Amino acid sequence: MLRLARFYSLARTKAIHSHGAPFRPEYALKCGLEIHTQLNTKNKLFSQSTNSATSLVDAPNHHTSYYDIALPGTQPVLNLEAILFAMKLSLALGSQVNSISQFDRKHYFYGDQPQGYQLTQHYRPFARGGKINLSKELDDIDESAKEIGILQLQIEQDTGKSHYTETDKDVITLVDLNRSNVPLIELVTKPDFSDIKQVRAFIKKYQNLVRHLHISSGDLETGAMRVDVNLSINEYARVELKNLPNTSSIINAIKYEYQRQVELISVGDTSSLMEPETRGWTGSSTVKLRSKETTIDYRYMPDPELPYINLAPDVISGVRGLMPQLPDDIMRILMKKPYQLSLKDAKILTYNSNQNDMYNHEALRSYYLDTFREFSKLAGERSNAKLPTNWIIHEFLGDLNKLQIPLAKAKEILPPPVFAQFLKLLHEEVISATSGKMLLFHILENFEQSNCQDLSIPDFSKLIEKFELHAINQVDPQELMDLCNDVIAQHTDDTFIRNLVTGKKKSSLKFLIGQGMRRSQGRIKANEFEKKFKEILNIQW
């Protein structure tokens, strides 16, 4: 019986993961999120301990103070940097920052919570309201626009972390308090999500926002950002989903739980959906953790050791005046004239990933904009907006990643005015695109081989002369004919040529053109090769 039940569960999970849960109109999904975000302040929330909760190299219990381990007699001292970070996020979300907020004790007993309570903001949270706007244009959702409302934001302290080790006789629990008392912001959304795309887009946008504001790494994998899901179907009781370590787990858990509840409703077995419950995600299914009857009474009470947080209006307005331009606004500017970037390229300049050590989005965007301005001055009204985009975002970044050169280093030999000069050579067809790629890679490769110590600015004219990279304006017909015949002669397979001539495999023509470009070192343009190959092979399509 157990094997059969397990087989049914795995089969259902496989179907959900393969095809996606069918969100049917008659089973309306209502979903909200609770997101805990660790703040990357210098110190912890109520002590002077170094805030290094997500470090993978530090020894356990290394970043702790007497207060973090709840030594009797120690008292909390509020870290004002956490207040500043919370204010930045609240203003970015359009939330109403409360002039007065307070900390409350949330009582429960657990090994990694040595105080016996957690300091949070239950009665008077830091901010209320706000929203994140999603759109089809920027976020790939089905609706043209979708507003996800924010209920509140509150500041609280993180707990320690329990580690479990099995021995022959028992299971040993080890507690690491490096994470204890790390500042968190808990964001609670309204239950405004109605499908998976909206959830995925919201998490990605919120993650980028906290990185953009420099208040958190936003990494789900390290626990710097943790997401709980609340969902219900057809107004049945709310189910909370926990243990969701990454975006794919969040999405798959929602799909699975939706399908599980739909099956119960469709057969009339709704008794288990009448009361709220908490379920955990195992990686393949959701399992019951606790129900309403076993819900903990946290006995909230105002903390007697911490005064109210009083924020004067001029403090809030002062922080508002220092707020940076937000990612959506930046992307919309980049996608319009004069830049005219695609959404994909605009996101490269706006969305920051902590996994990329070669550059951050702000430095890259600044480099792009400065180069664009310099190139526009040189090229005047005839400037091509696509040149800076293609050569910086695609060719230049590709070379930096391949050679493992940080953007900050590469800027020393190719500052924006110099890169603009390089783009001018391409724009005026002094060199071809193929020659440009060779020239750019050569410059960066030499720089990398000098351990990024040779800071001499490249002399493009000398390099073009040295490697004979000048584009040929007047093509020697005989030279072009010989090059094309040599390329064709390399392909003795009649099928290759026949499929090309008949149009069965048109892509083969691009292959021949590429070989011709390489043989001419990019000096002869691609369209010259295309015309000559079609003439020689009598291609009619």
Curated annotation (Swiss-Prot):
This protein's superkingdom?
Eukaryota
Q: Which cysteines are joined by disulfide bonds?
A: none
BP-aspect Gene Ontology terms: glutaminyl-tRNAGln biosynthesis via transamidation; mitochondrial translation
* Keywords for this protein: ATP-binding, Ligase, Mitochondrion, Nucleotide-binding, Protein biosynthesis, Transit peptide
Coiled-coil ranges per the record? none
Mitochondrion found in the keyword field: yes
Q: What is its EC number?
A: 6.3.5.-
- Catalysis performed (reactions): L-glutamyl-tRNA(Gln) + L-glutamine + ATP + H2O = L-glutaminyl-tRNA(Gln) + L-glutamate + ADP + phosphate + H(+)
Q: Which InterPro entries match?
A: Asn/Gln-tRNA_amidoTrfase_suB/E, Asn/Gln-tRNA_Trfase_suB/E_cat, Asn/Gln_amidotransferase, Asn/Gln_tRNA_amidoTrase-B-like, GatB, GatB_Yqey_C_2, Gln-tRNA_amidoTrfase_suB_CS, Gln_synth/guanido_kin_cat_dom
Relate the protein's function as given in its record.
Allows the formation of correctly charged Gln-tRNA(Gln) through the transamidation of misacylated Glu-tRNA(Gln) in the mitochondria. The reaction takes place in the presence of glutamine and ATP through an activated gamma-phospho-Glu-tRNA(Gln).
**HAMAP family, per database record:** GatB
The annotated subunit structure for this chain is: Subunit of the heterotrimeric GatFAB amidotransferase (AdT) complex, composed of A (HER2), B (PET112) and F (YGR102C) subunits.
**Record's protein name:** Glutamyl-tRNA(Gln) amidotransferase subunit B, mitochondrial
Q: Tell me the organism.
A: Saccharomyces cerevisiae (strain ATCC 204508 / S288c)
